[in-house]
């Protein structure tokens, strides 16, 4: 089994924020990354790294309908492999991209290997079902959120 467990990380580090309000996509990313900074899992510069990546590549981390996974390469700013999860009351839109985003799953990985072999497979399993995404967006508290996550086999794509 993986050493990086999506649900366990969210619970252990208290990195879930539900029904947040963001004026724009930058504030949405800030809401998503701030819990990781507050828990000292990433340095504040990690947020800047994500903004630089968006400026260079566009919103490459919109991965499903209503879902973005803000992350960037570790440039020495990631202290520990971690996740955050934020839902928004209203969608945000990235510049020149018509896709709405209401669920943000923050990811910070210490290495590319962790990113591709442990983190991404769990997130893919979580968001591949649009009903699960809808149910996550409807959650009013962490108990209901974790109950939705428990319905998903997060390890099905792990090798």
Curated annotation (Swiss-Prot):
The active site is at 71 (tele-phosphohistidine intermediate). PROSITE patterns: PTS_EIIA_TYPE_2, PTS_EIIA_TYPE_2_HIS. Coiled coil: none annotated. Its main location: cytoplasm. Keywords: Cytoplasm, Kinase, Phosphoprotein, Phosphotransferase system, Transferase, Transport. The modification Phosphohistidine is found at residue 71. Signal peptide: none annotated. The PTS EIIA type-2 domain is phosphorylated by phospho-HPr on a histidyl residue. Then, it transfers the phosphoryl group to the PTS EIIB type-2 domain. The phosphoenolpyruvate-dependent sugar phosphotransferase system (sugar PTS), a major carbohydrate active transport system, catalyzes the phosphorylation of incoming sugar substrates concomitantly with their translocation across the cell membrane. The enzyme II UlaABC PTS system is involved in ascorbate transport. This is Ascorbate-specific PTS system EIIA component. It comes from Mycoplasma pneumoniae (strain ATCC 29342 / M129 / Subtype 1) (Mycoplasmoides pneumoniae).
């Amino acid at each position: 089994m993986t050493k990086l467990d999506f649900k366990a990380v969210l619970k252990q580090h208290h990195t879930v924020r539900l029904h947040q309000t963001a004026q724009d996509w930058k504030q949405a990313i800030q809401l998503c990354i701030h819990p990781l900074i507050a828990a000292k899992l990433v340095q504040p510069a990690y947020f800047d790294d994500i903004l630089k990546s968006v400026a260079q590549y566009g919103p490459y981390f919109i991965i499903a309908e209503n879902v973005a996974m803000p992350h960037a390469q570790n440039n020495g700013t990631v202290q520990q492999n971690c996740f955050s999860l934020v839902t928004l009351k209203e969608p945000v839109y990235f510049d020149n991209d018509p896709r709405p985003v209401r669920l943000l799953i923050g990811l910070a990985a210490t290495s590319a290997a962790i990113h591709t072999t442990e983190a991404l497979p769990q997130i893919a399993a979580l968001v591949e079902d649009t009903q699960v995404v809808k149910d996550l967006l409807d959650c009013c508290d962490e108990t209901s959120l974790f109950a939705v996550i428990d319905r998903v086999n997060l390890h099905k794509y792990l090798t």
